């Protein structure tokens, strides 16, 4: 497994960027993952002869000069972060009208993969991983940077077990370019969306704390606190309902594990504190 996803050669077939060299330096080797705003590639840095991850924004986002300036500013800010639990940003630029950002290539898997395979995760192990996430977010917040899109897909676990948070700086640039949540567009993954991003369209440092609390809840219980269709239903619950205690959800859905490895009261209290509206 590699940065953000498994390498599947078939996903690279027909991708026009595979085989290209961005700015005469970054040779695109294969596609790793595709999201709503960008595609992530494995690439070779010809200048420093190393493997990197390159995130290329989709066509159209680079046409707006204001977005290009914000993207550049946010990428530069993210590049200043120095923390072992932050995926390092090496470079950024624009190639053929498409903004891109060059990042550390992490061999491993995402927290989403861990949750899918192992959840409910024992409390001590979950807390150990969340401590690393908190360290990364703390460094960002001290630098004045809010992540805005904390979710399991943006948390990487290396082959050595090191936890790293990816995508600092990108969510803000994209969301500022498109629209605020109050204008009808749900920025970020709705399952982890902080209430204030929905009600005011603005994210603060505690917005990342809220999303981290939701992520910890899912790790502990194997389920998200709010589900439903359409996504606006889940968004409404984030704004109007309190997150249930993880211990109660675990006891109801996985009674055997709740007896073998119960969630302590202080962990319940931590989730409640993180997700307080």
PLM features: residue spans?
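AlphaC helix of the eukaryotic protein kinase fold
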Residues: 56-80
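Conserved short submotifs of the Hanks-type protein kinase catalytic core
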Residues: 96-110, 114
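Protein kinase glycine-rich loop
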Residues: 28-35, 40
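Activation segment signature within eukaryotic-like protein kinase domains
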Residues: 129-130
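Activation segment of protein kinases
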Residues: 11-17, 63-66, 159-204, 229, ...
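Protein kinase catalytic-loop region centered on the HRD/HxD motif
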Residues: 133-145
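Activation-segment/catalytic-loop signature of the eukaryotic protein kinase fold
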Residues: 92
